[in-house]
Amino acid sequence: MKKRIFSSLFAICLVLLLLPLQVYAVNPIDVSRPCSLRVEYSYDQQAFPGQKIALYRVADCFADGTWELSGDFAGDPVNIHGITSQTEWRQATSTLLSYAAADQRTPFREGVTDSAGQILFENLTAGMYLIPGVLAESSDGNYQFEAFLVVLPPPAQEGDHLYDVTSKPKCSHSTPTPETRRYTLVKHWKDTGYESSRPESVTVDILNNGQVVMTQQLTRDSNWTFSWDVLDDGSIWQVVERNVPAGYTVTATREGNTFLLTNTRSGGVVKPPQTGDPMIFWPYILIMCISGCALLLLGIHRRRLVQ
């Protein structure tokens, strides 16, 4: 009877060990396998052919699902690790895009949408790619397709990775009005306890349709803000911070007519795992299983003593 109990407990322990390993197992990415990206530009069943599309490669992807900024983007003070929300993805997209535009970086690939408003990029290596926004002008107004970041292949915990991806960027329609619009630039600091590390000023380039049209200094005396008035003609405005202070990362976002530049102290930035060295869960699972079995054995032993 005693041997039977121990055999049963041992079998249960093995089952418990195997189940968590399946749940937490990392599905490796075949970084040598070619990827493709098809992008569709359409709105309310209306296709937009003849649109010039640029593709930037911003980060390398590794077999364990981590990535690292590379190429022209390698030195950008932008954190792409630990992103968990759509808001954070939009922040990373707009910030990387502002650097690409301000520095006039050369796209990795370029092309034009076909009659169906689609474009296909083939034979891409695994990595993170940036597609800038597209402004399509029409007789009934402007159609603005949002910029986006895409990881090829997208992360998958279970099953096969998807190496051929189709994306349809979000689009909004607007009618330019001949009126003056005020834009405001605001600098925000997320560095509690490190306020003394802030510089006296920061330099910001302001871009109109990808071209730098003014450079502005933001200081404490100006409350880290700047505003300008322009005629609303549907132009795309962007901002990019130059000479980001050491120890900080930056995000550039826009809400309505307000541009927000946020400097975050790097001490709180999530670092990626070492390449080829993904997080390992099985030692913790093994400890929990052994502890559970030990408690079961202890309970059985105590009941036998009582009897």
Protein language model regions, located:
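Solvent-exposed loop/turn and edge beta-strand elements of beta-rich ligand-binding domains
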Residues: 2-307
